[in-house]
A protein has these predicted regions:
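Non-transmembrane, aqueous-exposed alpha-helical and coiled segments at domain scale
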Residues: 1-183
Length: 183
């Protein structure tokens, strides 16, 4: 993967968020199960994006038995590899908050934007399969937003005069982002 994106080396990561947990076809299930059946284990803290099955209300999912079974198997395979079954597109809202400058490999576009801009951690957009490979190896290609020279802001918002208490609330940054977007 590093070669494909022109990265000369890999970088150690602290966490991963696997976007490829959502069932789009049997190939994704086969990939995840092959890794799990082969003894694959995540090397770093790893969260999972939403799956194609509501595990709390599986009867409300309008899919045939085959698709329901495949979705469940895909989700279960990643859990067997040691990923935390967060099943959310916003892992930062359930306690996963990488620190400033921390190297991570996250899939899911909103999480990537949040991690890179609000938290100041570093990730590229890792799609299905590559996100899992990063989680399993604890490494990601060193390119793009992982590198300092590619992290130049075009807009800087100074929130230093905002008291600390509101900034500690989970809703602060989404509300700030919404308000800024209206400007």
């Amino acid at each position: 993967a590093a070669e494909v994106v022109g990265a000369g080396q890999l970088v150690e990561i602290r966490s991963a968020h696997i976007d490829g947990c959502l069932h789009h076809g049997d190939g994704g299930v086969e990939f995840a199960e092959r890794l799990a059946d082969g003894g694959g284990r995540v090397a770093v803290d790893t969260t999972l994006n939403v799956g194609a099955l509501d595990l709390l209300h599986p009867g409300k999912v309008r899919a045939g038995a085959h698709k329901t079974d495949m979705a469940r198997r895909q989700m279960a395979a990643y859990v067997r590899m040691g990923a935390e079954p967060t099943f959310t597109c916003a892992p930062y809202q359930v306690g996963h908050l990488p620190g400033m400058g921390e190297q991570v490999a996250w899939g899911e576009s909103n999480a990537i934007a949040f991690v890179n801009s609000v938290l100041g951690a570093r990730t590229e957009r890792y799609g299905d399969f590559l996100d899992a490979c990063c989680a399993l190896t604890g490494r990601a290609p060193l390119y793009g937003l992982h590198q300092e020279e590619n992290r130049a802001a075009t807009v800087v918002v100074d929130a230093s005069r905002v008291p600390a208490a509101p900034k500690e609330r989970v809703v602060f940054y989404p509300v700030l982002g919404h308000w800024l977007g209206l400007q």
